[in-house]
Design a protein with these regions (language model features):
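Core segments of cupin and vicinal oxygen chelate
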Residues: 1, 11-54, 92-102, 106-114, ...
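Vicinal oxygen chelate
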Residues: 6-14, 46-49, 69-91, 117
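Helix-adjacent hinge/juxtasegments
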Residues: 54-78
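Short, charged/polar, Gly/Pro-enriched secondary-structure boundary elements
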Residues: 55-56, 123-128
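Amphipathic N-proximal alpha-helical interface segments
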Residues: 60, 129-134
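Hydrophobic, ordered structural segments
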Residues: 62, 75-76, 83-86, 98-104, ...
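Intrinsically disordered, low-complexity, positively biased terminal segments
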Residues: 65-68, 104-105, 116, 121, ...
Length: 139
């Protein structure tokens, strides 16, 4: 397994609407997707589309959400994870485990509609890494 391109940076936010407004008014972002719920992951997300990547804004749906826990420690929000693409998520999981990394959970469908996994921050210099199977079409 070889790491692919950066897909997005995930940012946990207490209010996705307020965060979208900040990216529009402060940074001039004009291409922001409509927020949508992902009940299986306990989050609401949207993407700020940039010329070379995306910023994923993530708001917890309820107190059971892992993002809620993150915001308890970081009330204003902050960088949550960095996502890289891989060709085959199952190959990536096997390679990560073989290399001694802690993979958090099983592959599941992420916000782009492709399979994802997370690698524990202790294996990546304190950064939570999301590995996402490369979308087969445009993204």
């Amino acid at each position: 397994m070889k790491i692919g391109p950066l897909n997005h940076v995930g940012v946990a936010v207490p209010s996705i609407e307020d965060a979208c407004e900040t990216y529009r008014t402060l940074y001039g972002a004009t291409d922001i997707t409509t927020p949508f719920d992902m009940p299986a992951q306990g989050v609401k997300v949207c993407f700020v589309n940039l010329p070379n990547s995306q910023i994923e804004l993530i708001e917890p749906l309820d107190e059971a959400s892992p993002i809620h826990n993150f915001l308890q420690k970081n009330p204003k929000g902050g960088q949550h994870h960095v996502c890289f693409e891989v060709e085959d998520i199952h190959e990536a999981v096997a390679a990560m485990k073989e290399r001694g990394a802690t993979v958090l959970g099983e592959p599941r469908i992420g916000a782009h509609g492709t399979l994802i996994i997370f690698v524990h921050p202790k294996n990546s210099n304190g950064v939570l890494i999301e590995l996402m199977e490369s979308p087969k079409g445009e993204h």
